[in-house]
Amino acid sequence: MQFSGVVLILISMTLVNFVFFETKVEAGKFGKCKPNICAKTCQTEKGKGMGYCNKTECVCSEW
């Protein structure tokens, strides 16, 4: 009974690691625009008030 519990824990840990690894890879593909860097870039370099991420590109507001 204890052996099957250990095997079950090992299998579940492997599945959890696989799911989190896949999530990181998927987020990396679409994570090109970083909101904090976008906002700073719009404020300092372009003289705009705010910046936000629209999918993968940084968009500066007009005001």
Swiss-Prot record:
One of its GO terms (cellular component) is extracellular region. Disulfide bonds join C33-C53, C38-C58, C42-C60. One of its GO terms (molecular function) is potassium channel regulator activity. It is found in: Secreted. Residues 1-27 form the signal peptide. Expressed by the venom gland. Its main location: secreted. Keywords: Disulfide bond, Ion channel impairing toxin, Neurotoxin, Potassium channel impairing toxin, Secreted, Signal, Toxin, Voltage-gated potassium channel impairing toxin. Negative results: does not block voltage-gated sodium channels rNav1.4/SCN4A, hNav1.5/SCN5A, mNav1.6/SCN8A and rNav1.8/SCN10A, and Kv1.1/KCNA1, rKv1.4/KCNA4, rKv1.5/KCNA5, rKv2.1/KCNB1, hKv3.1/KCNC1, rKv4.2/KCND2, rKv4.3/KCND3 and hERG potassium channels, when tested at a concentration of 0.5 uM. Has the structural arrangement of an alpha-helix connected to antiparallel beta-sheets by disulfide bonds (CS-alpha/beta). Reversibly and voltage-independently blocks voltage-gated potassium channels rKv1.2/KCNA2 (73%) (IC(50)=196 nM), hKv1.3/KCNA3 (50%) (IC(50)=508 nM), Shaker IR (30%), rKv1.6/KCNA6 (22%) (at 0.5 uM). Interaction of Ts15 with Kv1.3/KCNA3 is stronger than its interaction with Kv1.2/KCNA2. Belongs to the short scorpion toxin superfamily. Potassium channel inhibitor family. Alpha-KTx 21 subfamily. This is Potassium channel toxin alpha-KTx 21.1.
